[in-house]
Design a protein with these regions (language model features):
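Generic structural "secondary-structure junction" signal
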Residues: 4, 19, 24-25, 153, ...
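Active-site anion/phosphate-binding pocket segments in diverse small-molecule metabolic enzymes
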Residues: 10, 19-23, 216-252
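A short small-residue
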Residues: 12-17, 176-181, 215-216
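Conserved N-terminal beta1-alpha1 strand-loop-helix module at the mouth
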Residues: 12-33, 37, 42, 54, ...
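Generic structural signal for well-ordered, non-membrane alpha-helical segments
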Residues: 22-29, 33, 115, 191, ...
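Active-site-proximal beta-alpha core segment in soluble small-molecule metabolic enzymes
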Residues: 45-211, 233-236, 240
């Protein structure tokens, strides 16, 4: 179960804490969540929780007060979102199996595919399910500030997402959104440069889709993060593409 204490961690005798266990300071969590919610409301974007960085489900009742939705990368994370966050997941995985995909559909509101061939393979199952989920395609803007190629999803030869040259002038019927994930503990200026590349390589699609998921890596709770620049950047992008719902994934922040 969950034990609560009104004292800050600095005033608790850590030797009396049963081990092993997770210890979380609620005040600090709420401080971060309050900032994230403020960005969400001021910029008019949707910010969702990324389980890969924070999946302490006993804290979800607190998180839901600020962020009601989450992202998943497996059927089990999607189930966690549905059952413990109380909302269907925005799901992306580099690969799906036909055995697992019905569960992905059951627990998701959005499903992003890594390639066109993957979309064409599974879209009949989406249609058979009544088109309840919104389908997206992961794109590779061929630009990232990540310095180590091993962790760079845009490195030469990367198979994470579709490059612009592999797409024609229109997206296949059924694709309602685009998704990129190229940042890691990055700044708002990194996002600005990335969005410029997304517009340059995929701008022809942006007026015609419903949403753009900008992935994770937005460390907006870091002390030196320029939150005001982020809000202005997002507002400006929405002014150019008023049809788009902008989605950000928050994990470590």
């Amino acid at each position: 179960g969950v034990q609560t204490c009104a004292l800050p961690i600095c005033m608790i005798d850590i030797n009396k804490i049963p081990s092993p266990c997770y210890v979380m300071e609620e005040k600090l969590l709420r401080n971060n969540l309050s900032l994230i919610k403020s960005v969400k409301e001021r910029a008019g974007v949707n910010i969702i929780l990324a389980f890969k960085a924070f999946a302490l489900w006993k804290a979800f009742p607190i998180v839901r007060e600020y962020i009601p939705f989450s992202t998943a990368s497996s059927k089990f994370e999607a189930q966690l979102a549905f059952e413990e966050m109380g909302s269907p997941a925005h799901t992306y995985s580099p690969a799906y199996t036909e055995a697992d995909f019905p569960l992905i559909l059951r627990y998701s509101s959005h499903v992003t595919f890594n390639s066109l061939s993957q979309f064409h393979r599974f879209y009949p199952m989406v249609r058979a399910d009544g088109n309840r989920v919104s389908c997206g395609l992961r794109i590779n803007p061929e630009y990232s500030d990540v310095e180590t190629d091993l962790y760079n999803p845009c490195a030469p030869g990367s198979r994470m997402g579709v490059t612009g040259d592999l797409l024609g002038d229109t997206l296949p019927e059924g694709i309602e959104g685009l998704h990129f994930h190229t940042l890691c503990e990055s700044t708002s200026y990194d996002l600005e440069r990335t969005l410029a590349e997304v517009e340059r390589r995929f701008g022809r699609f942006l007026p015609h889709v419903k949403w753009l998921n900008m992935g994770g890596g937005h460390l907006m709770t870091r002390k030196d993060y320029d939150v005001e620049h982020l809000i202005a950047l997002l507002k400006g992008f929405k002014e150019r593409y008023p049809n788009l719902e902008l989605i950000m994934e928050i994990g470590r922040a």
